[in-house]
């Protein structure tokens, strides 16, 4: 209700049927929050109708029309001309007004007991009239239905839908979608002397419409001793697919100390104001430092370090008495 000092009324469209071409028959139900006896009413009609009849008289002592018995709870059926919107599927109900006239004519004799505010007023439909602050200037929302009631064999439309929820004469519509991320991690490691040692860790998590996999493989062939340990973790966020793989292979015949740390960070953000839009941000920083030291029992030794800022670390250490050939 956009007007002050007027009894609050609600209106709903209870049924719609397609007649022909752009003509539809609609039924509306109007109800007030309080009852007003019929004796106070002089005239009640629907005006400004875009249809075969521009005025639908429901009650009028001058017109001798008495189609309703309660001005605060009544139903009316009439025809309107309605046209599909730009999508070709939706038809909006044309706007109209319901005009109330209390305490007019011979009903004025009851003025001393009148207690419901303004006595003559119009209540309008629609959601296309706003003031500078965005407040609706109509009293009832707009309604719509499917074009020519397609999909219903009996020629009737699915119950007409309101344009939205109306609160303090403002129509608002909103949709919220949420998603949940579930993560699982599996870790394994092994250490062997005078043999080939392999350790791998794989962590994967899956969220709606997204898969992330990360794997680290470390292998070494030694004549003395080999120790290999690796740990990998990965995370997944909605609507992104990311894959990362790190492989390290070392063959030694001298004394080799190899230490590597690999870290991967994935960050995915979704703009709540953009439908079906995903922004992926990948950040990785790797620094490598190789130092060769002379040793009496080997031509040289090497030290390799790799560091990245993230939530996942991989560390491999190998000590052998051979030559060094690191490959990343």
Swiss-Prot record:
The gene is BSC1. Open reading frame exhibits genomic organization compatible with a translational readthrough-dependent mode of expression. InterPro entries: Flo11, Keratinocyte_PR. Residues 168-259, 286-328 are annotated as: Disordered. Residues 291-328 have a biased composition (Low complexity). This is Bypass of stop codon protein 1. Residues 1-155 form the Flo11 domain. It holds the Pfam family Flo11.
